């Protein structure tokens, strides 16, 4: 069956690559694995061997029929749905597992949506493993003063330890995409989250500050609080130069700035 462009389908079949990807997951058998976009089940075949429960979410009816024909495993559940429309928290609540991980050969066109949907339930997850466009993977794992650094980098760092695992050459897929991919892993923790009383508000705060990367942090902050003098005072209190641009601040500085503005009585 041919891949469907409108679903962003690109398939893998190399067994060494499949094993290498699945190896990135924590190899604790007693866990729930949620696979997003299993396609023809290349990863699924290995997942059902290694883990107690695997739930796959696939939007394409044709792929679902292939999966149902290929697999007859008691530890596999196949759900036909658009993952962006599923309540993942409610889905997870159906299963009694302490260790829950997500794995996905992510369609390029909904990468950000899937990432942010995953981050929203990070407190329920142990780990996530994503195959992404290489450029996006580098962006997620970048740090301040690096070209790719943006609000997505900070959002992923806020919820997890980010790891750039390895590059996947585009020739490993069929049909062959235009660019290489890469595997990243997010190991979830509360190191930064416990410093903030409203994580969603913080993520939106950072996103707004990155709306115009060419502007200084002072001008972008002024767009939020609508008071340039007050914005300058906040930056001075934290010893942050008003001439810096958003990509020149690290996550600790963003957290301090957020808390100063929204928690303190200053």
From Swiss-Prot:
<dbReference type="InterPro" id="IPR011530">
    <property type="entry name" value="rRNA_adenine_dimethylase"/>
</dbReference>
<keyword id="KW-0963">Cytoplasm</keyword>
<dbReference type="InterPro" id="IPR020596">
    <property type="entry name" value="rRNA_Ade_Mease_Trfase_CS"/>
</dbReference>
<comment type="similarity">
    <text>Belongs to the class I-like SAM-binding methyltransferase superfamily. rRNA adenine N(6)-methyltransferase family. RsmA subfamily.</text>
</comment>
<keyword id="KW-0489">Methyltransferase</keyword>
<feature type="binding site">
    <location>
        <position position="12"/>
    </location>
    <ligand>
        <name>S-adenosyl-L-methionine</name>
    </ligand>
</feature>
<keyword id="KW-0698">rRNA processing</keyword>
<feature type="binding site">
    <location>
        <position position="37"/>
    </location>
    <ligand>
        <name>S-adenosyl-L-methionine</name>
    </ligand>
</feature>
<feature type="binding site">
    <location>
        <position position="105"/>
    </location>
    <ligand>
        <name>S-adenosyl-L-methionine</name>
    </ligand>
</feature>
<keyword id="KW-0808">Transferase</keyword>
<feature type="binding site">
    <location>
        <position position="82"/>
    </location>
    <ligand>
        <name>S-adenosyl-L-methionine</name>
    </ligand>
</feature>
<dbReference type="Pfam" id="PF00398">
    <property type="entry name" value="RrnaAD"/>
</dbReference>
<dbReference type="InterPro" id="IPR020598">
    <property type="entry name" value="rRNA_Ade_methylase_Trfase_N"/>
</dbReference>
<dbReference type="InterPro" id="IPR001737">
    <property type="entry name" value="KsgA/Erm"/>
</dbReference>
<comment type="function">
    <text>Specifically dimethylates two adjacent adenosines (A1518 and A1519) in the loop of a conserved hairpin near the 3'-end of 16S rRNA in the 30S particle. May play a critical role in biogenesis of 30S subunits.</text>
</comment>
<dbReference type="InterPro" id="IPR023165">
    <property type="entry name" value="rRNA_Ade_diMease-like_C"/>
</dbReference>
<keyword id="KW-0949">S-adenosyl-L-methionine</keyword>
<dbReference type="GO" id="GO:0003723">
    <property type="term" value="F:RNA binding"/>
</dbReference>
<dbReference type="GO" id="GO:0052908">
    <property type="term" value="F:16S rRNA (adenine(1518)-N(6)/adenine(1519)-N(6))-dimethyltransferase activity"/>
</dbReference>
<keyword id="KW-0694">RNA-binding</keyword>
<dbReference type="InterPro" id="IPR029063">
    <property type="entry name" value="SAM-dependent_MTases_sf"/>
</dbReference>
<dbReference type="GO" id="GO:0005829">
    <property type="term" value="C:cytosol"/>
</dbReference>
<feature type="binding site">
    <location>
        <position position="58"/>
    </location>
    <ligand>
        <name>S-adenosyl-L-methionine</name>
    </ligand>
</feature>
<feature type="binding site">
    <location>
        <position position="10"/>
    </location>
    <ligand>
        <name>S-adenosyl-L-methionine</name>
    </ligand>
</feature>
<protein>
    <recommendedName>
        <fullName>Ribosomal RNA small subunit methyltransferase A</fullName>
        <ecNumber>2.1.1.182</ecNumber>
    </recommendedName>
</protein>
């Amino acid at each position: 069956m041919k891949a469907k462009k409108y679903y962003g389908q690109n398939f893998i079949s190399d067994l060494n690559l499949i094993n290498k990807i699945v190896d990135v997951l924590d190899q604790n058998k007693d866990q729930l694995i949620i696979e997003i976009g299993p396609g023809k089940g290349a990863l699924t075949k290995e997942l059902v061997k290694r883990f107690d429960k695997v739930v796959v979410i696939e939007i394409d009816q044709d792929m679902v029929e292939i999966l149902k024909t290929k697999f007859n495993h008691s530890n596999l559940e196949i759900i036909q749905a658009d993952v962006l429309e599923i309540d993942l928290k409610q889905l997870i609540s159906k299963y009694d597992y302490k260790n829950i991980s997500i794995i996905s050969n992510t369609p390029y066109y909904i990468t950000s949506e899937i990432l942010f949907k995953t981050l929203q339930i990070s407190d329920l997850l142990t780990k996530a493993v994503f195959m992404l466009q290489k450029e996006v993977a580098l962006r997620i794992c970048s740090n301040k003063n690096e070209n790719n650094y943006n609000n997505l980098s900070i959002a992923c760092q806020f919820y997890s330890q980010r790891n750039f695992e390895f590059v996947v050459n585009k020739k490993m897929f069929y049909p062959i995409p235009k660019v290489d991919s890469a595997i990243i892993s997010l190991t979830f923790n509360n190191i930064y989250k416990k410093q903030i009383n409203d994580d969603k508000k913080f993520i939106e705060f950072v996103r707004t500050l990155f709306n115009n990367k060419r502007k200084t942090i002072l001008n972008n902050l002024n767009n939020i609080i609508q008071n340039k003098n007050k914005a300058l005072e906040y930056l001075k209190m934290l010893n942050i130069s008003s001439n810096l641009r958003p990509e020149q601040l690290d996550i600790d500085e963003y957290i301090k700035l957020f808390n100063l503005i929204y928690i303190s009585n200053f």
